[in-house]
Amino acid sequence: MIFNIGWTLLYLYWRIFYTVPTESGILSLVAGIALLVVEILGMLEAFVHYFNMSNIKYPKLPKVEPEDYPEVDVLVATYNEPIEILYRTINGCVHMDYPDKSKVHIYFCDDGSRKEVEELAAQMHVGYIKREDHKGAKAGNLNHAMSLTSSPYIATFDADMIPKHDFLMKTMAYFADQEKKNRELPEEEQVHLGFIQTPQTFYNPDLFQYNLFSESRIPNEQDYFYKDVQVSRNKSNSVIYGGSNTVITRRALEDVGGFYEKSITEDFATGILIQKKGYICYALNEVLASGLSPTDLKSLISQRTRWARGCICTGRKLHLLFTPKLKFAQRANYLASVWYWYASWKRFIYIMSPILFATFGVMVVRCTLIEVLIFWLPMYLSSNICLKMMSHNIRTTKWTNVYETVLFPFLMIPTLLETFGISMKKFKVTKKSGSSEKKDRTWYYAIPHMVLAVLSVIGIWNCVRWTFDTGRIDYFVILFWLISNFYNIVMSIFFVMGRKAYRKYERMEVKESCEITNGIVTACGMSQDASEGGISILLKEPVDFDDEEEVYITIHDHKYEARVRGRVVLVTRKGDLWKYVFSIDDMLQSKSEYIYIIYDNFTSMPVNLDESSSSFDDLRLNITGRTPKKVFQNRKMARIPIQADVKSESGRKVTIENYNYKYLLLSYAGERLNGLSLPLCEGLVLQLSYQTVIGDTMYLYRIMNYAALHKDPKKQEKISQWIREYRFGGTMQYERKRSLKKERVLALDEFSEMNSL
């Protein structure tokens, strides 16, 4: 970090005094100064971040006696969100742990006055608060709820944010502990907590992860802010109130007049006002709740526009630059937060600067290749290394550039208007319905990026041509700059192109013990992932679950048990195990428990960048991911490799190649047999009917007496014993050889059915 700061200061000295094109015309001078200004401001922002990250303060969870936990009101603000989203959230709330649950008061704060929300509140046995007017938007809604409740602490959740079972236990402990300490201190020595902010994470891939085919390669775009930036601000008491997943003291809210209603980012403003009053606020880096990230580009742009306008408006109205009630470190952090939203202009200038020179012949920076290698390169490399190290491999400069390039065309005008006091009059709630836009409705969002791509290609061509014409390598600097920007632009175009959404429900990684039964056989296994529409379970042995019949699945976690009804939709191999995927047709009487188990176990999004991936991989994935794929298989019964020589009742010798309970693949020489009876062991005979030929000597037969065998528990046990004998009895090497041949095919459709569940 010190090395980077030193090189950055040296670089700035060189840039300020030696590189501004003062003799190349007014356009060059303006462009050169604009680039220099955004570089200086960006580096000041980086220095603030370096200061914060130099000695991070992680609040230690205190030990609190059960009787010391105070009363708390849980407010879930809603306006027009779908009922199924509200159900998940309130279900998470009612399952939160607390020593005395009578001290937890949960309320729907309904700004839409909807009958169905009131009915849901009654069904879940929680409070319901509505209001007839919408004055003050979300802040007004929460203030109205405050006037009707009385607990000393208030937990706020957005309508889609599902708390985990330990949310209150891991947030309220700080307040309870501080209360106890304050009782032993005189008033002037007491420390009063304002709020505890926990990360806002998401159980669905955000648009950057999903549209760029990187769900398993990059963390959620917001993770860096909530898990690193926020926690780093603890030591300066400048943690930003994020509006959800937070516990606030009623006293602090009353001291600042409630939630701030004069900004469309009421959370940002309210947090600043609380800290102005001297309250101490902490951010935690442990995920205690998860929500639904915007699922379409229009909603994402609307959300970021509101955040940008709201932060700039708040900075202006609360006089962040000159207020005496904030310490210098607090002012610096909040000003950096406001400046962050001008990244759209910074990104535009970074992209246009090399284009101005290479495409239009306008000089922006006056320098030589040697100077760039001496002053810029060490600063650039050390900055990249610092960001990666300080972010704990959550964020890199490359991905920051991609995120900014995607959004900058849509934020430039709103931030400019807000800077001059032309504010957004109407509060827009971010759409979070789980549906996605059609690709043909979003192409026009890519027009700015397409124009810049064309200009960049022209500039790249000119640099290459000039290099060959002059024999000089000075143009390599501009060429590198253009290619770097072009990569970001191409990734932005890929992002805007979107990606078709197949899933109706988000699928979570859930590893819990399960039992499956059809009333004839019962199998025990371990779940792998689950959604509201389906679940996949690993079994040690194949089981005869008919895809045309219903099965009952019981899933257990450390506290609850859920029993649901479904049917098998896909069976594949996973190593030496069998993966059964079931659709869920009915949650029976276990909906609350099943929903809780799914969302409380949320762990499936990546928390770090995939270090093995490169920019080439990013482009390759986005090209191949958009290539139509064929699904080769859709197996709903386990296909079991077998190598058993058997004689039919007529004396014909055949070899069983594989078996899936309903069909049998045989190989034999000689005349084709249209039908035969095949005894596998004593008391177990298969009645076969010819279906088709595969190759020269392989024949597929249907098992005509499958229904009778399937419904007979004794026959089922004989079949299982026969499979174990011939699958593992000296044939493992043969089986593995056959499995490897099919591995590529199976991998292509392993989750094909689950994609829609």
Residue spans for each PLM region:
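A conserved acidic beta->alpha catalytic loop
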Residues: 109-117, 133-134
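Structured alpha-helical
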Residues: 438-757
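Short, acidic, metal-binding catalytic loop of nucleotide-sugar glycosyltransferases
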Residues: 91-103
